[in-house]
């Protein structure tokens, strides 16, 4: 089943959520030798550059972002966790609108590190998240299974996230370390 999704929450200059039509000059390339994905696009006349890497031996990704949208507060990272339902497939597998039947909690491990704990019946898994740079981490609402990582006062930002069956700390690695291993 789907463990969760990680994405960007993008805001237009007026503070409303951006849609795909608001993005310009979108381009994405994958280096077939290393597996690194390079993405770029524009929003609010500002360029966004993203580098995504995947660990070869762990369920871990690393993401580096360069954009003034971070500094403006118009770009954040979300982590969203569904209720597993293999029969429901609209955009992603799972029900993101189902609040009951599963729990999502988080604990702060260090100033730039949290661990999200997921529970569904007898199933437990963990999603530790580390980042570099100033940011706030919060739950979107008490009932939601969505968490927001909001970079502050920076135009460059990176984070790593891992999915693990064990509640281990220090499971993530810096983006550059993951990239060297790929």
Predicted regions and their residues:
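Acidic/polar, glycine-enriched structural segments that form the non-catalytic walls/loops
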Residues: 1-182
């Amino acid at each position: 089943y789907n463990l969760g999704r990680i994405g960007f929450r993008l805001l237009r200059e007026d503070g409303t959520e951006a849609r795909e039509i608001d993005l310009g000059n979108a381009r994405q390339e994958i280096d077939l030798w290393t597996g690194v994905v390079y993405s770029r696009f524009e929003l609010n006349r500002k360029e966004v550059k993203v580098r995504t890497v995947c660990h070869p031996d762990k369920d871990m990704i690393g993401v580096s972002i360069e954009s003034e949208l971070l500094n403006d507060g118009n770009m954040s990272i979300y982590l969203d966790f569904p209720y597993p339902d293999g029969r429901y497939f609209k955009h992603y597998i799972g029900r993101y609108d189902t609040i009951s039947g599963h729990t999502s909690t988080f604990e702060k491990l260090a100033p730039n590190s949290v661990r999200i704990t997921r529970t569904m019946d007898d199933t437990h898994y963990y999603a530790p998240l580390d980042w570099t740079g100033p940011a706030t981490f919060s739950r979107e609402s008490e009932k939601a299974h969505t968490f927001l990582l909001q970079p502050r006062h920076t135009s460059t930002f990176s984070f790593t996230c891992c999915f693990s069956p064990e509640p281990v700390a220090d499971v993530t690695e810096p983006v550059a370390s993951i990239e060297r291993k790929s």
